[in-house]
């Protein structure tokens, strides 16, 4: 039973009812985990940069990826830590490579997502595809058309996003667990990546498809809830908690329990977020 989260340095004990968890203590836990993840990310990228090919295009692209990866609340990474603490009763502290890799996966997904959504900013920064297009226009002047500049920006951003996906696996490899556990982490991580992409496919194609709530409500509702489950529930809650539990040595029963708790919770979160987006004012 979960009663409260009691933190001492990086150890968290869970022993009370969820409704009784001290909110401030949990927020402090998230903030402390974010600091740990941010520091580890800088270290990992510094190490990785030593092996990067000597090419200015690649190194500039890596810097763009690092810049886009900085900041953020690191909630998913913190949930990986929480999953590990639950599974190991606060005894294991191997979560950081998985958390850093997962946060890089999120950054890479968002780089691609910004192209799909035609977003111009992300975390207060100009998105990579927009920034790349602007810079090539500035450097080439009248020598490049708007269309070609936009195509270049999108192409470069796609490459950088792909680069981030593959680097994230190298970060996971730093996890100091035995090979059997690491293999399970890789397997689950790959599953989460695939399911997130499946959700993105449905989310991208559905608005342009002839299926609508008016024509076939049941089919439309099913697809909307698939998006909720794949893009939010798995990617934001279930996946991180399950990865942490696997890292902490949790058995299949615990991992499955976390999944069964997190998926409906994540779905409910996305429904509420959508409702706020539709009905709330800017002041809310």
Regions found by a protein language model. Give the residues of each.
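Conserved N-terminal diphosphate/IPP-binding helix and adjacent helical/loop segment
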Residues: 1-102, 107, 111-150, 200-222, ...
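All-alpha helical catalytic cores of prenyl diphosphate-utilizing isoprenoid enzymes
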Residues: 44-55, 67-76, 155-167, 171-282
């Amino acid at each position: 039973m979960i009663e409260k989260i009691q933190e001492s340095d990086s150890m968290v004990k869970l022993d009370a009812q969820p409704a009784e968890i001290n909110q401030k203590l949990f927020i402090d836990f998230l903030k402390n985990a974010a600091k740990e993840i941010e520091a580890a990310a800088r270290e990992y990228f510094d190490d990785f940069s030593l092996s990067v090919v000597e090419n200015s295009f690649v190194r500039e692209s890596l810097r763009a990826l690092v810049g886009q990866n900085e900041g953020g609340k690191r909630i998913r990474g913190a949930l990986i830590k929480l999953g590990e603490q639950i599974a190991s009763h606060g005894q294991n502290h191997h979560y950081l490579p998985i958390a850093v890799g997962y946060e890089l996966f999120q950054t890479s997904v968002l780089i691609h997502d910004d192209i799909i959504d035609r977003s111009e900013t992300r975390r207060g920064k100009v998105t990579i595809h927009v920034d790349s297009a602007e810079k090539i226009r500035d450097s080439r002047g009248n020598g490049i058309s708007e269309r070609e500049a936009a195509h270049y920006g999108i192409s470069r951003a796609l490459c950088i996003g792909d680069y981030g996906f593959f680097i994230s696996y190298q970060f996971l490899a730093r996890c100091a667990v035995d090979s059997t556990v690491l293999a399970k982490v890789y397997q689950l991580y790959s599953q989460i990546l695939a399911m997130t992409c499946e959700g993105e496919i449905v989310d991208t194609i559905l608005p342009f498809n002839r299926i609508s709530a008016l024509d076939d409500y049941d089919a439309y509702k099913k697809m909307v809830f698939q998006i909720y489950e794949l893009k939010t529930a798995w990617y934001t809650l279930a996946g991180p908690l399950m990865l942490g539990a696997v890292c902490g040595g949790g058995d299949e029963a615990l991992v499955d329990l976390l999944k069964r708790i997190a998926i409906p919770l994540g779905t409910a979160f996305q429904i509420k977020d959508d409702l706020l987006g539709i009905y709330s004012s800017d002041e809310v």
